[in-house]
């Protein structure tokens, strides 16, 4: 049995890292913000990368082994047997892949719908590429609101004109709430998209990270989603943010669109990234299972710690990802929000307060769009010792504040 990957590194070892999570703040800050995990590489992934380096295998990526590995994993893990390698393309990472898919099916000025609170780059990447962001907010329960989606699709279609195109960015599982969309919810999305002529692009980067009590359903496996796209990667499941690679997958009716993707896009992924991601999907399942057990334990621990140390803060139990969404509005902290698009590193309200007063870094909810103000996102992919210390600090700061 593989040991818990989340309990293999000390804080002293983690503080030697040079990545964003551990370098963006001073050493006295405990970082529970950006979506990096505090783990070592899965052994089989490390072996594949070391072997490539030892052999000088550091050229350009080639072939379909990455797509084949994802197809095999999807078949075994999710019983999705229709991931046809001929309908895939390698892309540098999921968000750059999203932009490339939008360029295939929309034009500058067209509307792109998102469901906030949602991953901040959904706003930034879309806007910077000249598309208009429209919102279909999640419901009060943090799940997809099909009535809001219908209203947004209808408004977007009316405002787009007779020749306008409309797209919807689905986050499946959803970041930051950790909601894993049900088959019924995804059927609802597909039916509405067909009715209003909206093309769906599904960001499924967190797909391997679904915890007990929920089941991941690939959007492209839903009847009616044949003209959609999905983006997948091992980035989140195996902590490969610095080894970039992702796959764009087209539904049967979208295959011709995907074939129009510029050839130079395939030069963007790192060859070492593709080697690492392929190894993760092919040989990393036992490590992933051990990670999921560790995340299950941390999810339960975090619930207890919030109850103990943060009275008045509402904890929303995530079904997937290693992220949870805390409603801190009852604490009454002022929000000072700058104009314009917010970045994942921007701080306001409770996130700013907890950083200043408890030396714990969280992600500020305002960056996630409508419904995010007064919330924070917590990354619980770390050791239990760090979680306990972080929540204890936050609790002590609140006691002193009051």
Swiss-Prot record:
Pathway(s): Amino-acid biosynthesis; L-methionine biosynthesis via de novo pathway; L-homocysteine from L-cystathionine: step 1/1
Cofactor or coenzyme needed: pyridoxal 5'-phosphate
Taxonomy, superkingdom: Bacteria
EC numbers on record: 4.4.1.13
Catalysed reactions, as listed in the record: L,L-cystathionine + H2O = L-homocysteine + pyruvate + NH4(+); an S-substituted L-cysteine + H2O = a thiol + pyruvate + NH4(+)
Enzyme class: lyase
The keyword Lyase belongs to this UniProt entry's keyword annotation: yes
GO biological process: methionine biosynthetic process
Listed GO MF terms: cysteine-S-conjugate beta-lyase activity; pyridoxal phosphate binding
Keywords: Amino-acid biosynthesis, Lyase, Methionine biosynthesis, Pyridoxal phosphate
CDD domains, per database record: AAT_like
SUPFAM superfamilies with a match to the protein in the record: PLP-dependent transferases (SSF53383)
N6-(pyridoxal phosphate)lysine found at: 236
Family: Belongs to the class-II pyridoxal-phosphate-dependent aminotransferase family. MalY/PatB cystathionine beta-lyase subfamily.
PANTHER family with a match to the protein in the record: CYSTATHIONINE BETA-LYASE-RELATED (PTHR43525:SF2), PROTEIN MALY (PTHR43525)
Descriptive protein name: Putative cystathionine beta-lyase
Lineage: Bacteria, Bacillati, Actinomycetota, Actinomycetes, Mycobacteriales
């Amino acid at each position: 049995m593989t040991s818990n990957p989340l309990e293999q590194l000390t804080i002293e070892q983690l503080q030697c890292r040079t990545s964003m999570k551990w370098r963006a703040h001073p050493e006295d800050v405990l970082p529970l913000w950006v979506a990096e995990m505090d783990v070592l590489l899965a052994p089989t992934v490390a072996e594949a990368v070391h072997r490539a380096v030892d052999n000088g295998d550091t050229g350009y990526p080639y072939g379909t082994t990455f797509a084949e590995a994802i197809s095999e994993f999807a078949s075994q893990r999710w019983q999705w047997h229709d991931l046809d390698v001929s309908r895939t393309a390698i892309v540098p990472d999921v968000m750059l892949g999203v932009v490339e898919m939008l360029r295939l099916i929309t034009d500058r000025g067209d509307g792109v719908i998102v469901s906030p609170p949602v991953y901040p780059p959904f706003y930034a990447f879309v806007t910077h590429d000249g598309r208009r962001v429209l919102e279909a907010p999640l419901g009060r329960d943090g799940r997809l609101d099909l009535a809001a989606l219908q209203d947004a699709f209808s408004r977007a279609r009316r405002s787009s004109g007779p020749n306008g195109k409309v797209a919807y960015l689905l986050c499946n599982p959803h970041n930051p709430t950790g909601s894993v969309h049900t088959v019924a919810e995804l059927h609802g999305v597909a039916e509405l998209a067909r009715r209003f002529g909206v093309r769906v692009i599904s960001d499924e980067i967190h797909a391997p990270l679904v915890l007990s009590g929920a089941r991941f359903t690939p959007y492209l496996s839903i009847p009616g989603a044949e003209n959609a796209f999905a983006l997948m990667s091992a980035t989140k499941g195996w902590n490969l943010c610095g080894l970039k690679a992702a796959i764009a997958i087209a539904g049967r009716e979208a295959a011709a669109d995907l074939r129009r993707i510029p050839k130079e896009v395939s030069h963007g992924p790192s060859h070492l990234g593709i080697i690492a991601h392929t190894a993760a999907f092919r040989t990393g399942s036992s490590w992933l299972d051990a990670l999921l057990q560790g995340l299950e334990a941390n999810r339960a621990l975090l619930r207890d710690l919030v109850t103990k140390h943060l009275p008045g803060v509402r904890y929303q139990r995530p079904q997937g990802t290693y992220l949870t969404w805390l409603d801190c509005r009852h604490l009454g902290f002022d929000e000072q929000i700058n104009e314009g698009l917010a970045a994942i590193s921007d701080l306001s309200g409770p996130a700013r307060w907890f950083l200043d007063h408890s030396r714990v870094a969280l992600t500020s909810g305002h960056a996630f769009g409508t419904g995010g103000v007064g919330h924070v996102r917590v990354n619980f992919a770390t050791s239990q010792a760090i979680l306990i210390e972080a929540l204890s600090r936050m609790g002590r700061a609140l006691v002193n504040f009051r």
